[in-house]
Amino acid sequence: MTKFIGCIDLHNGEVKQIVGGTLTSKKEDVPKTNFVSQHPSSYYAKLYKDRDVQGCHVIKLGPNNDDAAREALQESPQFLQVGGGINDTNCLEWLKWASKVIVTSWLFTKEGHFQLKRLERLTELCGKDRIVVDLSCRKTQDGRWIVAMNKWQTLTDLELNADTFRELRKYTNEFLIHAADVEGLCGGIDELLVSKLFEWTKDYDDLKIVYAGGAKSVDDLKLVDELSHGKVDLTFGSSLDIFGGNLVKFEDCCRWNEKQG
């Protein structure tokens, strides 16, 4: 059954909700921000832990976020996942407090070429059950979903399809997919992508798939549950009341999870 998954997005040391497609690596560029929290990251870590919202992730969007990430992880040790700048030199350090590490850009060269050997290396160090592979993507004009890196600004040579999941499941049992084109817009999920995620992974019972991007109603949990036959979990961000949104109540999402058991 589809579950609600929480997030803690960090930007310059603060908990924020950002429109995904507006993030860049340029210092002079300011991303479009939906919300800046007055609470520290540990506040949200405690909130998720107290309500037993399993599988939540802390994402470091750029530099100056390590302290805030540690604060969240140490508030709820071994409960939250962490991503952003994860590689083979720091993964074990983060796993002192995190349940899993989320890896993205490090799996690619600067030009966007996928490096399977890097994922193999990470699996050797951490174990496949402590790694989440982030396959966040953008949709191309010809209807394909291509994995995007560098704050979702650079398209890579890795396409989301059945072959990709078949190969990468050897090294991890969880994937996180942000639909970058709709992330932070509260304009609705990418229904076709959610359906495809089920189609591509339906034969792998042990594989966990988490989708993020565009969720705007608690009813989206039911929608994702139907589209993915319960295979895909759903992350809410900017639409949630705990992040300044007025479309979705955190309490309602928690009740959904409790009903699912």
From Swiss-Prot:
Cited InterPro entries: Aldolase_TIM, His6-like_euk, His_biosynth, Isoase_HisA-like, RibuloseP-bd_barrel
Superkingdom of this protein's organism: Eukaryota
Keywords: Amino-acid biosynthesis, Cytoplasm, Histidine biosynthesis, Isomerase
Gene Ontology terms: biological process: L-histidine biosynthetic process
Pathway involvement of the protein, from the record: Amino-acid biosynthesis; L-histidine biosynthesis; L-histidine from 5-phospho-alpha-D-ribose 1-diphosphate: step 4/9
GO molecular function: 1-(5-phosphoribosyl)-5-[(5-phosphoribosylamino)methylideneamino]imidazole-4-carboxamide isomerase activity
Entry annotated with the keyword Transmembrane helix: no
Enzyme nomenclature, EC number: 5.3.1.16
Pfam families: His_biosynth
Family per similarity comment: Belongs to the HisA/HisF family.
NCBIfam families assigned: hisA_euk
Additional detail: Present with 6490 molecules/cell in log phase SD medium.
Role according to the record: Catalyzes the isomerization of the aminoaldose moiety of ProFAR to the aminoketose of PRFAR.
Protein name: 1-(5-phosphoribosyl)-5-[(5-phosphoribosylamino)methylideneamino] imidazole-4-carboxamide isomerase
Gene name per UniProt: HIS6
